[in-house]
Amino acid sequence: MKTLCLLFAVLCLVTWTQARGAEVEENLTAQDGEVDIAGDNGDVQLTLNTDDFESFTLKTLTLGHPRVKRHSCVCRRICAARQVRKGRCSRRRRICCLY
């Protein structure tokens, strides 16, 4: 019975973790104007740990175009209509990327 309860608890934890995947934040620092996200599944919201770069290149495969490996991003208060909100910059601005 204990094994069954433990198995059920693990299953619930895995399901809960997957459901919260869209809320996961990843803190990154831009280096040479580029941010590299190797394992981004598209649900990660980023927090950029720098105020130095007003614009940068986001290296990921998951902003809607699987063949595009780099996206041009900027830190703005409001994202334009053709931009995807990918997180926030450290000055209460959003990371807005062209898709």
UniProtKB/Swiss-Prot annotation:
It comes from the Eukaryota. Residues 1-21 form the signal peptide. Lowly expressed in spleen, and expressed at lower levels in kidney and lung. Residues 22-68 form a propeptide. GO terms for cellular component: extracellular region. One of its GO terms (biological process) is defense response to bacterium. The keyword Signal applies. This is Defensin-A4. It comes from Ornithorhynchus anatinus (Duckbill platypus).
